[in-house]
């Protein structure tokens, strides 16, 4: 049997005024990805699948996001906002190409799944002309009701037009639809705007399908899957649902979470086996954590790769470009950025490692700072395998510390250090026997006039 081709049109032209934000609504994020990205990633892909995104005239950023997520996406502009059917027909050129299945979705429903799109296509394979996604909200007030007779959809009745009996129906319209591509354009072009707002409503397609003697049907899904985002409160609710999904998926994959509700994940986080995540950890986009790694409490990771049996935290911040080798350790109050830390290396306390490469087995003492920025550009620090950096050292980049080299505590290193060498760069220690006693005696007699280290007692 030949695989059916598909066109998915994602409507993303809404202004989103209730978000109270300068950011287009569909670019707000859930689990580290834009609302639009979640929908695009759920849409069919691969051979025979095409994608179109309808944007507003002033939303170049939305077009750019669509191309970032799905380079195969075509974008079309809805220059006037005249209803959902009008928005779909902005992509008339794509529809006319004649895919077998036409899917219509919304860019502000980030919880919809690929499986739901596939279920919505099944009635088309079975001969239906139109399939509408339905759901049962806790409170159906305000939603269009789906009127079903004999297993077929006969109408979508808006709340204002519904009879008292129809308002008792709990099956509601989610807005997501699938059309048989052979008849989709003809049906869409028959939708008129004879209503109080003068707009073209996609819901009118049901009546047109019925008038043509064709079949419309309903596929039901959960209310969460079609949760639309119009306010910041709804955005937070969607985040909570997504985080619950991600946590459960991680737990089912074998990740140990001591307090799952305190852990926040990104949609693209990947885990190996026997990973442990302690409480109050935030994992942003682009993080992969290999087998046996432990992420201790109160750590924050973004765009970082964690090797097997590595350890992070507690209270660590791993910024983009961090790569932690197998068995390496990042300890408490350590920040890394664009740092490659090879297997077995240790950065245990109170340290900043930026634009650096640390060799295998190196030890970075507490309070070490890689001074990577000169006010104009970033510079690289290279620390060889097995090197030992004493506590409270400053490494002024660009600089290379050779393999096996030792850096004395408190040093400021601005020149390269050869392999196996010792480098010390600090003021010499001076000891004056009895000075402290004489100073205290002088103070007690009121002879010391200042509050600093006074005059030297001779």
Curated annotation (Swiss-Prot):
The record's free-text note on cofactor binding: Binds 1 Mg(2+) ion per subunit.
Gene Ontology MF terms: glucosamine-1-phosphate N-acetyltransferase activity; magnesium ion binding; UDP-N-acetylglucosamine diphosphorylase activity
Residues at which acetyl-CoA binds: 366, 372-373, 391, 409, 426
InterPro entries assigned: Bifunctional_GlmU, GlmU-like, GlmU_C_LbH, Hexapep, Hexapep_transf_CS, MobA-like_NTP_Trfase, Nucleotide-diphossugar_trans, Trimer_LpxA-like_sf
Segment forming the signal sequence: none
Keyword Heme applies: no
Cofactors required: Mg(2+)
List of residues binding UDP-N-acetyl-alpha-D-glucosamine: 11-14, 25, 78, 83-84, 144, 158, 173, 230, 319, 337, 352, 363
SUPFAM superfamilies: Nucleotide-diphospho-sugar transferases, Trimeric LpxA-like enzymes
Gene Ontology BP annotations: cell morphogenesis; cell wall organization; lipid A biosynthetic process; peptidoglycan biosynthetic process; regulation of cell shape; UDP-N-acetylglucosamine biosynthetic process
Cell compartment(s), UniProt: Cytoplasm
Residue ranges of coiled coil: none
EC number of this enzyme: 2.7.7.23, 2.3.1.157
GO cellular component, one term: cytoplasm
Binding of Mg(2+), residues: 108, 230
Gene3D superfamilies for this protein: Hexapeptide repeat proteins, Spore Coat Polysaccharide Biosynthesis Protein SpsA, Chain A
Reaction catalyzed: alpha-D-glucosamine 1-phosphate + acetyl-CoA = N-acetyl-alpha-D-glucosamine 1-phosphate + CoA + H(+); N-acetyl-alpha-D-glucosamine 1-phosphate + UTP + H(+) = UDP-N-acetyl-alpha-D-glucosamine + diphosphate
Region feature N-acetyltransferase, mapped onto this chain: 254-458
Keywords recorded for this protein, A-Z: Acyltransferase, Cell shape, Cell wall biogenesis/degradation, Cytoplasm, Magnesium, Metal-binding, Multifunctional enzyme, Nucleotidyltransferase, Peptidoglycan synthesis, Repeat, Transferase
Region (Linker): 233-253
Family the entry assigns: In the N-terminal section; belongs to the N-acetylglucosamine-1-phosphate uridyltransferase family.
Entry-linked NCBIfam families: glmU, PRK14353.1
Function: Catalyzes the last two sequential reactions in the de novo biosynthetic pathway for UDP-N-acetylglucosamine (UDP-GlcNAc). The C-terminal domain catalyzes the transfer of acetyl group from acetyl coenzyme A to glucosamine-1-phosphate (GlcN-1-P) to produce N-acetylglucosamine-1-phosphate (GlcNAc-1-P), which is converted into UDP-GlcNAc by the transfer of uridine 5-monophosphate (from uridine 5-triphosphate), a reaction catalyzed by the N-terminal domain.
Oligomer status and interactors: Homotrimer.
Stated name of the protein: Bifunctional protein GlmU
